């Protein structure tokens, strides 16, 4: 007999890390494997990723991007071609040294990212400006040998999409870089209900080998920042290293201008930490594997299960719906689907059938209402949209209430010690100040936002003339 009680989870106020771990396990998103840092995506977790993948894939294809697949292995000599790139990834690389019992003539890297493979391929297929642009995307897994791991947020192997494009001009590659960043931002806000801040990474924080890195940053329940997606403009850094040239419109050889960008299952970690509560997962409706669950009450009584099945037939025209007709108690089912974060629960029993109504319960607010069975097809899509907007607005209010503006080093240190959240402060642009803030205040630069504010004339750290406002914070 299955246990008739869903165990409680740790409260986020008591131990945020354990709260998060409890949710990913008890909501049956993942399980741990026998290899440290490698997670098993269970059906519910993978269905969530598939829904996210489907939306993103459609958006990329609609903007002219094509899916490809590159090998998992990269020869060491190929990885070494772009100096900054290899130095940036060297500590995290996993190496294959043997094939069977034989030692390989050259070590093979298990891809941490695929820039070098795409570059090698591009150098073979591009001759003229007529061959440009090339807009490629790949869905795959990558491996980075992380020391500290946590499901979705930082794992040894993770799933992602990585886009790689080459262009005729610097203007085109810059436009592509920002268009993708905007696509990521709209995906987070319009589908995951996560508000983001768009901006540029500092030189210290940018991607290894990039000319410029742009990011979307979001704020978690514990006041830490999460880098949710990045888009990189490589300029000609990689094309020069890999000799990717084309004949331009004047018959002269030029290097291509290149971009790279990606989002991963890390977004799922963000979704959990932005929306969930002490009762479990809260799923944003647009990507939820199941949007509506029907729980028959006293299903052994005549007509109850048949009515639930009839309702499912109507609702499946407008939402992803399932019936739980198992022999577990209604109480167990209520707890189970609350833990799994299903946006809407419908309860239908003999008395409800008599009144031609169902009990509708929202996961996000716990609000309960009686609704006519005849209105479900119309009401459910509107309610799912309402839930999405409510989740987004709640997360935005939380972010704004936990964002602080400071104008002095002492004020910044006090806020960082006493509060959790984003800190906005002016910066001179010097790496030395960035490193001092990291060491003495415990915050890193999250981004130089596109929407700038003039908080003061001086750098918060050294007092010299400030060049821009920066979002700072503790981060995953």
Swiss-Prot record:
CDD domains the UniProt entry points to: ProRS_anticodon_zinc (cd00862), ProRS_core_arch_euk (cd00778)
Location comes to: Cytoplasm
Keywords on this record?
Aminoacyl-tRNA synthetase, ATP-binding, Cytoplasm, Ligase, Nucleotide-binding, Protein biosynthesis
A Gene Ontology annotation in the biological process aspect, one of them, is: prolyl-tRNA aminoacylation
For the keyword Chloroplast, the answer is no
Report the catalytic activity. tRNA(Pro) + L-proline + ATP = L-prolyl-tRNA(Pro) + AMP + diphosphate
Q: Name one GO molecular function term.
A: catalytic activity, acting on a protein
GO cellular component term, pick one: aminoacyl-tRNA synthetase multienzyme complex
What job does the chain carry out? Catalyzes the attachment of proline to tRNA(Pro) in a two-step reaction: proline is first activated by ATP to form Pro-AMP and then transferred to the acceptor end of tRNA(Pro).
Q: What is known of its domains?
A: Consists of three domains: the N-terminal catalytic domain, the anticodon-binding domain and the C-terminal extension.
> Quaternary arrangement and interactors, per the entry?
Homodimer.
The family note in this entry says: Belongs to the class-II aminoacyl-tRNA synthetase family. ProS type 3 subfamily.
Task: Identify this protein by name.
Answer: Proline--tRNA ligase 2
Which source organism? Bacillus thuringiensis subsp. konkukian (strain 97-27)
